[in-house]
Amino acid sequence: MENKCIESEQIFFAKMNRYSFKLSDKKWQLDKENCVYPHKVVDRMPTKMKLSYLKTLAYYASEYSSFYIQSVNNLFYKWFGAMTIDTIDDKAIYQLNVYLGSARNYKLNIVKAFITKWKKLNYPRVEATALRMLEKIKIIPNQTGEAVKRRDPNKGPLTETEFNNIINAIGKFYHEKKIQCFLYCYILLLAITGRRPLQLISLKAKDLIKNERGCFLNVPKVKQRKCFRKEFNMVMIEPFLYDSLSMLINQNQAFVEDKFSVGISNYRGELPIFMNLDKITETKRIEDFLSDLTTDYFHMKNSVMSKLLKHCPSKFDVRSERTNSYIELNARRFRYTLGSRLANEGASIEVIAKALDHKSVNSSMIYIKNNPENVYDIDKRLSAFFNPLSNILMGIEIEENKNFFIKYVSDAF
């Protein structure tokens, strides 16, 4: 596609405020964290399809999260790299389904939504036969929670001992001033609230609340395709964590005031709790700082926090009781741990879903199904049924076991 065809196109705005792009841009920066390279995809497409893809992706970028746009772009990159496609029709969809296989068949949902919008926008190169083929194919839902099911020592929930060792270690090293306040607060919030990393790094000072009922965090929703900081859930926290977060906010305010040599008390509430100090340092004028304060620009990057979290166990010598190796630590394991602990304590599926901020109870079922106490109880109940039956089949005390089996069945009704 010649650049002159798209250079005159309008500027498109990403879902996240502050970020925009043109169709001709090689790189579309969608928020502080994520960007996409759509021209790597269109370089693999026939000429008459290129503009259609770019326009549809631009529409998506204005409506959906950057992570979702990355998923779309990455999937199309692999699809058009694996086979030659002149138009997206039933044959192309069939080939994609074969290419994905049963394990990744769920990704067809991404394609289905995207090309349906493509077709509705009346852009060429998507045939109605493609949509009909997608209706015929049985799309298998993504199997989530495998690490929870297996109680994976490296990816699944932490044991009580492992969890306590982590919390004790960061507390010890924080008081010894060997770990920074922001990382200490971040790990505690992951452990206590079970919230997703993006929810925590989206927090602002005004989200920290103290009243006669206690201490709270007003945590923004992020996964359910919400706009940046538009919907929230209130979470209660302990007073000691409130104090630590207040101290962190004070440090952030002092850093900004020192940088610009001006007081910002009136804007304190807008300060990110987890602030990217490098971005503050790079900003030249207080006017530019205030202009970007309502966006995600000065919030810490998730990738940076994940890397710091990953290195904590080796830095502070925290090992797994199951493998004797350094614990593989990430935010997801804290969520798994909270869900599993609640299930062990007998919490209902609704309570677990609310605690983990799940959109529905479906994602929380994995904790109830795989609660070890539930498994033990089921096994105990079934053994009364299977033990006499297996003895009969093996010829052991047939009459006695037959009576046991008949009694069990009759008692069951």
Briefly describe each language-model feature range.
Residues 173-179, 257-275, 315-328:
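Short helix/loop segment immediately N-terminal to the Walker
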Residues 200-201, 336-339, 346-357:
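Active-site-proximal segment of tyrosine recombinases
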Residues 1-32, 311-319, 372-413:
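Acidic, low-complexity interaction regions
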